[in-house]
Amino acid sequence: MKFFVVIVFCAIFLSVSGDSDNMQDTCPTAPGEQSIFFINGYPCKNPTKITAQDFKSTKLTEAGDTDNYLQSNVTLLTALEFPGLNTLGLSVSRTDLERDGSVPFHSHPRSSEMLFVVKGVVFAGFVDTNNKIFQTVLQKGDVFVFPKGLLHFCLSGGFEPATAFSFYNSQNPGVVNIGEVFGIDQEHIKIMTRCLATGSGCRVTDGDEL
């Protein structure tokens, strides 16, 4: 009897915790001005007004602006920017890295991430809950996975700019930037990321050892 109760409980838990299946074939996000209520997600566009353009985006065709201190840019498309993704549990991003570019430690609380390198060399890694770091060098055509919620980073690892695309199993993965949480400036964040990635002893400009 106890075993039966446990089985029933597990079945109920899995059915509640899993994502719901789509109730219709498509559900492009409705424009903001048409939203009159708030839900966990985005309301669907009027079915009579859905077109093929709702499922196409050209926002990742061009490189992002890397003229900044980190010399990098991440362009993320969620269901808000790409209506056709709504209810599909997917999102996508493009990462552009200059020769010394970096995307410092951050996490996605609602999604895992699969990174696919299409140009250059990328040094990427993540830290698990045992504080163990997993890192590797990625070249064109290589794929690397960042588990859900774990801190991760990527750096340009070659002598030329690098480009990678990421795919997420959530239409809104969310981003937690460690530097912004603790008010650490970008210079220190960039140095810390490279120190952890290379395993070398580093010192920041004020002489404090990292």
Swiss-Prot record:
This is Germin-like protein subfamily 3 member 4. Glycans are attached at N73. Residues 1-18 form the signal peptide. Mn(2+) binds at H106, H108, E113, H152. May play a role in plant defense. Probably has no oxalate oxidase activity even if the active site is conserved. Disulfide bonds join C27-C44. SUPFAM superfamilies: RmlC-like cupins. InterPro entries: Cupin_1, Germin, Germin_Mn-BS, RmlC-like_jellyroll, RmlC_Cupin_sf. The keyword Disulfide bond applies. Keywords: Apoplast, Disulfide bond, Glycoprotein, Manganese, Metal-binding, Secreted, Signal.
